[in-house]
A protein has these predicted regions:
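Substrate-binding/active-site clefts of carbohydrate-active enzymes
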Residues: 215, 225-419, 439-449, 454, ...
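Active-site-proximal helices and loops of the catalytic beta/alpha 8
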Residues: 35, 341, 411-413, 417-521, ...
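Solvent-exposed, low-complexity, repeat-rich "mucin-like" stalks and linkers
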Residues: 32-62, 117-137
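C-terminal motif of bacterial Sec signal peptides marking the signal peptidase cleavage site
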Residues: 15-16
């Protein structure tokens, strides 16, 4: 199954690019602006949060907007823009009158998805794209970096030829040509063509850990991975805690040792996702399975739990002493980078432990554990997704309030300020309001404009909900649990049809784009291993 899912990942990585188009040159950037996608095919008006697409811009009052025929800016107010567009591809251009920079943002309508473009061949000066079907009305839009191309694409069915302009050929480092297409009311697959020093990237050996579309993750839970420093071992050894849910000794020093041994390089991965490293409570919490009114059963084993997993933060900016010191963490990150590996940190923003000094000092910073109708607000994942508590000892933070949101986004950035992490895996994203992600994304882009930081989130839900968090100014990616759950059924049950997974993959491509970086996984710490299902 791992090989099949990797093939899916590579297919979405390599499937990229074409349209009729034009471009100016902006500074080289690793993450081109994501397109504005109208979410409703019937409603031609949409309100846009500018920070979702231009988080690097500090003052939106300095922006001047222009559009193409069929697309119109209705109003700009309080960092929001109201846009109307017909069912055609368009471009919203934002010019910063203060810096002189221009940004071209693709605008795509919601439409039926169809695979219609493939890259066919290239030379040093041209790229040829094959259009798979004959269309009556074909629109092609080509951008290099965040600017529309200046020369039109030459299209004679079945081929469209893009001229690689002098500015593209003279660019240093990695840049991208993007192609968007509409045909006869259908949304065609978009294409992404990476360039290195102005030449088409044609070999996987040219891909590095900094290429978002080439991320291959290895997830590990620190306490259960490898013990590299026995001096920091400290079990609870409590009669209330079964040994299996006590600390086992894994630590950051153990990860460093395995990196040096070549364990991760031999696996062929380029990004290590480590579990949370913030300080958790010293004592045991939780008492399975008394939740939800379960009665005591003498035939079952009951236990409290240690915080070995890391998801009960007492402090949001201090390391768990059982796992590491600052010095050991710096060493691990340095060694990882020398071995060509990213390290992303699992970060918990949704909640804190009830004994956190932060909540002791600000007891009103969490949401209410009782709903207005008197019910307990626990594990109501969809009904009360922004306020529900995961458990009685980990209150959900009220991040819709600015006085709570602002310091919590600053706490997340401490890990980038103090350490050379390459990004975050964010826990429980759908339970955190969008204003948190917008503030975090804007602060990150403005404080670290030249640093490559990649963020992937955890959200269970439909593509619309999952995709609402994936914007240039929020998350780069989310795990695609819809593909995961479908794959588990299809690969694990002989009676299931492969058509199901094909449908789910096509739905993801239509929702997130053909070169999205959504995470296709074979499992994680919340899921049983496939072999045990």
């Amino acid at each position: 199954m791992k090989q099949i899912l990797l093939s899916i990942l590579l297919a979405s990585t390599l499937m990229a690019c074409c349209n009729k188009a034009c471009c100016d040159r902006n500074a080289n950037t690793q993450n081109p602006i994501m397109p504005i996608v109208f979410v409703d095919s019937e409603d031609h008006t949409q309100v846009i949060y500018l920070t979702d697409y231009l988080p690097q811009v500090a003052n939106f009052d300095k922006l001047v907007f222009t559009t193409e025929p069929g697309c119109q800016v209705v109003c700009v107010k309080d960092g929001m823009l109201t846009l109307t567009c017909d069912n055609r591809l368009s471009v919203l251009t934002a010019e910063d009158t203060e810096s002189g920079k221009k940004y071209d943002i693709p605008v795509t309508p919601k439409a039926e998805y169809q695979v219609g473009l493939v890259t066919k061949s290239y030379t040093d000066s041209t790229i040829t794209i094959e259009v798979l079907n004959k269309y009556n009305d074909l629109q092609l839009l080509v951008l290099w970096q965040d600017t529309r191309a200046t020369a039109c694409v030459q299209y004679t069915h079945p081929e469209a030829v893009i001229t690689i302009e002098p500015a593209w050929r003279e660019s240093k480092g990695r840049s991208f040509i993007r192609v968007y297409a509409m045909a006869d009311g259908k949304q065609l697959n978009d294409l992404l063509i990476p360039l290195e020093n102005g030449k088409v990237v044609n070999n996987v050996a040219q891909l590095t850990r900094h290429d978002d579309q080439a991320q291959v993750l290895y997830s590990l839970m620190i306490d259960r991975f490898y013990n590299g420093n026995q001096a920091n071992d400290w079990k609870m050894n409590s009669p209330e805690v079964l040994d299996i849910v006590d600390y086992q000794g894994g630590d950051i020093a153990g990860i460093t040792e395995k990196i040096k041994e070549g364990f991760f390089n031999e696996l062929g991965i380029n990004t290590i996702w480590i579990s949370p490293i913030t300080q958790n409570p010293w004592d045991a919490w939780g008492h399975y399975p008394f939740a939800n009114g379960n009665k005591y059963d003498s035939t079952k084993t009951y236990t409290k739990f240690s915080g070995y997993h890391g998801y009960w933060p007492i402090y949001t900016t201090e390391v768990e002493k059982r796992f590491t010191t600052d010095e050991e963490l710096h060493e691990m990150l340095d060694v990882a980078h020398k071995h060509g590996l990213n390290v992303i940190l699992d970060y918990v923003a949704n909640h804190m432990h009830i004994n956190s000094p932060t909540l002791k000092a600000h007891p009103d910073w969490h949401t209410d554990s009782i709903l207005p109708d008197g019910r307990r607000n626990f594990e109501l994942w969809d009904e009360a997704r922004l306020t529900t508590w995961f458990d009685v000892h980990i209150p959900t933070l009220d991040l819709e309030r600015p006085e709570v949101c602002s310091p919590m986004t600053d706490s997340a950035l401490v890990w980038l300020e103090k350490f050379e992490f390459d990004g975050f895996r964010h826990d429980a994203c759908k339970h955190i309001p969008l204003n948190y992600w917008r503030e975090l994304g804007a602060k990150m882009k403005q404080r670290y404009p030249n640093r490559h930081i990649w963020m992937i989130g955890e959200t269970y839900g439909d593509p619309a909900l999952i995709g609402s968090y994936v914007k240039s100014g929020m998350l780069n990616s989310q795990f695609d649990f819809n593909i995961y759950h479908t794959a588990i059924d299809v690969f694990g049950k002989p009676e299931q049809s492969m058509k199901r997974i094909n449908h789910t993959i096509m739905e993801s491509l239509a929702s997130y784009g053909s070169h999205h970086t959504m995470g296709n996984i074979s499992g994680n710490h919340d899921k049983c291993r496939f072999i045990s299902l």
